[in-house]
């Protein structure tokens, strides 16, 4: 596979990479779909001008998304997808990226192992250096990107993470990865074993027991019935099925640490 074929993929992460202690730089395309619309004039000029007047980035993004589903612009979504593909390839080839430089590919972003300096293509397409991470860790289908003050998780929506997990499971992953980034494998093992014991014995805050996924619920068994609860107090914690996070987060972390 050559670099152009790889960058044609819309969603790809190196399947052979479970742990990387190395800088990973995230480059994303500014104003994603709208920049492609402007560059290739995919909609009438009056519509482009209308969207330009929308100052709020999220609102502009939603407006572009709605256009791509509008029957008056059939084919727009496909043209935008082709535009993303075209400029991912342009970014990679212009910056001489090799296959081994790519950690992950998203629709409008690349996670790579080196700094890139050719960021502007045409009049409207511009990539930006969004994040610089010091480590990468894969836990099942989750991708964890570590930096000194936080960990970014791909595979659970940011809204769910912000609402429920930043102070709990995300902190466990962040601290565990901090030990790995510092090449302190011994304390990484000690830390995760201690957390696993506290987790199994229900000594942690209820927030740690919320399933670490987009459902983000508490599976509870009481009186022989299976319940799905969105909020829980200490009195119900003893009925919570804690296996999900234990099997999908804690055991994989321990396996990674003990194999180093």
Where are these regions (language model features)?
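Conserved acidic
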Residues: 1-260
């Amino acid at each position: 596979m050559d670099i152009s074929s790889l960058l044609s993929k819309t969603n790809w992460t190196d399947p052979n990479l479970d742990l990387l202690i190395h800088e990973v730089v995230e480059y994303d395309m500014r104003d994603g779909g709208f920049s492609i619309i402007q560059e290739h004039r995919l909609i009438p000029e009056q519509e482009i001008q209308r969207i330009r007047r929308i100052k709020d980035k999220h609102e502009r993004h939603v407006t572009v998304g709605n256009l791509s589903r509008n029957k008056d612009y059939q084919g727009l979504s496909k043209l935008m997808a082709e535009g993303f593909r075209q400029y991912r390839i342009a970014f990679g080839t212009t910056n001489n990226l090799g296959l081994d430089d790519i950690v992950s590919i998203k629709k409008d972003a690349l996670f790579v192992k080196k700094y890139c300096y050719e960021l502007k293509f045409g009049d409207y397409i511009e990539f930006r250096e969004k994040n610089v991470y010091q480590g990468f860790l894969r836990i099942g289908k989750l991708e964890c990107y570590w930096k000194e003050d936080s960990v970014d998780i791909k595979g659970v929506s940011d809204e769910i993470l912000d609402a429920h997990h930043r102070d709990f499971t995300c902190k466990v992953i962040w601290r565990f990865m901090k030990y790995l980034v510092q090449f302190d494998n011994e304390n990484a093992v000690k830390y995760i074993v201690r957390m696993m014991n506290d987790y199994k014995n229900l000594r942690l805050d209820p927030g740690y027991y919320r399933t670490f996924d987009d459902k983000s619920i508490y599976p509870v068994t009481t009186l022989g019935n299976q319940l799905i609860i969105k909020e829980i107090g200490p009195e119900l914690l003893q009925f919570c099925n804690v296996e999900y996070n234990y099997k999908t987060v804690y055991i994989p972390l321990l396996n990674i640490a003990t194999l180093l």
